[in-house]
Curated annotation (Swiss-Prot):
GO terms for cellular component: cytosol. GO terms for biological process: cholesterol import. The keyword Transport applies. Keywords: Lipid transport, Lipid-binding, Transport. One of its GO terms (molecular function) is cholesterol transfer activity. It comes from the Eukaryota. The keyword Transport applies. May be involved in the intracellular transport of sterols or other lipids. May bind cholesterol or other sterols. This is StAR-related lipid transfer protein 5. It comes from Homo sapiens. InterPro entries: StARD5/6 (IPR043556), START-like_dom_sf (IPR023393), START_lipid-bd_dom (IPR002913).
C-alpha cells in the first residue's frame, strides 16, 4: 500500500475516532453492568450500527495498552476470545501497518470464522492517552482465504485514557464498527456485539491481572 495514501487515510480515521469520542448525542444504552456501559447508534458508513463501550480497567495505562495493542506475538491473542490470529501484512512505519485479524465462529456457530484486513494507526496524545485507529482496506498480499468470510471494519478502535490522580486505573473507551458480511440475520448481529463487548472488558481485566501482577 502506498505509504503516503496510508498516512492520509489513517489520520482521517483517527480524526473520525476523536469525533466519536467527543460526540455524546444519539447513543442508546443497550447493556450495562460491572462498571461497563455499551451503547449504539446507527452507522453512517454501512447499514449497521456503531457500538461504543466504556469502562474502568484496574491497571496502569501501559499495562492495559500492553494487553490490547495490535502487535504480532502480543497478548491480545492470548486472552481475547474473539481473536484467533493477528499478523502484519505490511509495516509502513513503527505506528502504522496493514494487518490481518482472524476471529472464531460465534453465537453458537451462527457466525462462522471471519477475517479482517485493516489499516491500523497507533497514536499517543499529550494527556497520555493512547489510541488504536483502524479501518478496512484491500491489500494484494492478502486476498480472501478459504475457511473465512471476509468482514469489514469501518472506522473503529479504542482509547486508553489516564485517570487523573489514579495511576493504577485506566479508562478504556472502545468503538466496534463491523460489517460481519455474509448472510446473517440482523437480530443475531444486534445481540452478538453488546454481549461480546461486555465479555471483552471482563476478560481484559483478568488478562491485566494475569500478565502484570
Amino acid at each position: 500500500m502506498d505509504p503516503a495514501l496510508a498516512a492520509q487515510m489513517s489520520e482521517a480515521v483517527a480524526e473520525k475516532m476523536l469525533q466519536y469520542r467527543r460526540d455524546t448525542a444519539g447513543w442508546k444504552i443497550c447493556r450495562e453492568g460491572n462498571g461497563v456501559s455499551v451503547s449504539w447508534r446507527p452507522s453512517v458508513e454501512f447499514p449497521g450500527n456503531l457500538y461504543r463501550g466504556e469502562g474502568i480497567v484496574y491497571g496502569t495505562l501501559e499495562e492495559v495498552w500492553d494487553c490490547v495493542k495490535p502487535a504480532v506475538g502480543g497478548l491480545r491473542v492470548k486472552w481475547d476470545e474473539n481473536v484467533t490470529g493477528f499478523e502484519i501484512i505490511q509495516s509502513i512505519t513503527d505506528t502504522l501497518c496493514v494487518s490481518r485479524t482472524s476471529t472464531p465462529s460465534a453465537a453458537m456457530k451462527l457466525i462462522s470464522p471471519r477475517d479482517f484486513v485493516d489499516l491500523v494507526l497507533v497514536k499517543r496524545y499529550e494527556d497520555g492517552t493512547i489510541s488504536s485507529n483502524a479501518t478496512h482496506v484491500e491489500h494484494p498480499l492478502c486476498p480472501p482465504k478459504p475457511g473465512f468470510v471476509r468482514g469489514f471494519n469501518h472506522p473503529c478502535g479504542c482509547f486508553c485514557e489516564p485517570l487523573p490522580g489514579e495511576p493504577t486505573k485506566t479508562n478504556l473507551v472502545t468503538f466496534f464498527h463491523t460489517d460481519l458480511s455474509g448472510y446473517l440475520p440482523q437480530n443475531v448481529v444486534d445481540s452478538f456485539f453488546p454481549r461480546s463487548m461486555t465479555r471483552f472488558y471482563a476478560n481484559l481485566q483478568k488478562a491485566v491481572k494475569q500478565f502484570h501482577e
